[in-house]
From Swiss-Prot:
It comes from Shewanella denitrificans (strain OS217 / ATCC BAA-1090 / DSM 15013). GO terms for molecular function: proton-transporting ATP synthase activity, rotational mechanism; proton-transporting ATPase activity, rotational mechanism. The keyword Transmembrane helix applies. CDD domains: ATP-synt_Fo_b. F-type ATPases have 2 components, F(1) - the catalytic core - and F(0) - the membrane proton channel. F(1) has five subunits: alpha(3), beta(3), gamma(1), delta(1), epsilon(1). F(0) has three main subunits: a(1), b(2) and c(10-14). The alpha and beta chains form an alternating ring which encloses part of the gamma chain. F(1) is attached to F(0) by a central stalk formed by the gamma and epsilon chains, while a peripheral stalk is formed by the delta and b chains. It is found in: Cell inner membrane. This is ATP synthase subunit b.
Length: 156
């Protein structure tokens, strides 16, 4: 194998080319590759964080939904209890009002009955006096006396 000047010149040119590439071309390429790798890694990390945040948000939403349902059920239960209480109070009030009205009606009936009895007594007394006067006026005749007593009994 012959070593001539061309081979040495080509070797020197190749070494200069390699040195030039290593000094000026290779570092920007490596920086671009490293920067791209870093952006990809950051993007993947952000995606992982987003997935974790999404799961956390779903978990919180589920917990809040459960809490809201529990609160709603509690409010509904309290409303039902209050409804039952109001109904019971209304029934008790209605029963008391009914008893009051019945007692008042009975008292009015009793008062009216007593008034009617008193009027009847007065009328009976008046009739008895009138009957006695007529009997005394006709006391001579027993048939008339019997007739007046029968009329008086019929009127009473």
């Amino acid at each position: 194998m012959n070593f001539n000047a061309t081979l040495i010149g080509q070797s020197v040119a190749f070494l200069i080319f390699v040195w030039f590439c290593m000094k000026f071309v290779w570092p920007p390429l490596m920086n671009a590759i490293e920067e791209r790798q870093k952006r990809i890694a950051d993007g993947l990390a952000d995606a992982d964080r987003a997935v974790k945040d999404l799961e956390l948000a779903r978990s919180k939403a589920t917990d809040q939904l459960k809490e809201a349902k529990a609160t709603a059920n509690e409010i509904i239960e309290q409303a039902n209890k209050r409804k039952a209480q109001i109904v019971d109070e209304a029934k008790a009030e209605a029963d008391a009002e009914r008893a009051k009205i019945i007692a008042q009606g009975k008292a009015e009936i009793e008062a009216e009955r007593n008034r009617v009895k008193e009027d009847l007594r007065k009328q009976v007394a008046t009739l008895a006096i009138l009957g006695a006067e007529k009997i005394l006026e006709r006391s001579i005749d027993p048939a008339a006396h019997s007739d007046i007593v029968n009329k008086l009994v019929a009127e009473i």
